[in-house]
Amino acid sequence: MSKRPNFLVIVADDLGFSDLGAFGGEIATPHLDALALEGLRLTDFHTAPTCSPTRSMLLTGTDHHIAGIGTMAEALTPELEGKPGYEGYLNDRVVALPELLREAGYQTLLSGKWHLGLKLEQAPHARGFERSFSLLPGAANHYGFEPPYDETTPRILKGTPALYVEDDQFIDELPADFYSSDAF
């Protein structure tokens, strides 16, 4: 029997494929280049215009509307709220790749931004990741504290409060010097 391959999927928001050295980019990305040169490079994935719809397509292999992420949850308008395809989380009409991998005996881990649901029953552990440390919302605070805001602070500057989970538990408190890029 042949050995099954290990594989690693990296999702990087706001990074074009041509930004990486392995794809001819000018930015030095030696570690990512080494992974790309030693492995299989997928070169024909078509993205949605924003991150969570793209994430849902990558994890399910289907259209983001079928997966429940017709748009980012933060961008849902009152006209779309509650409509099929606009649930704002990875719905149960689709099977996620980590669920299939677990059934096949793979170990699965997610570290980083999830942006596919804000409740524990929508978090990575509920979609096949046996271990996870993740920031559930998109565009959230990546530090271990929430800055003070008042009513005069424009909404766009307030951002989204950080909401981290480890496996199936919300994290109530992060170290004061926490920064997500260091943790992930």
Which role fits each region the language model picked out?
Residues 1-184:
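Formylglycine-dependent sulfatase
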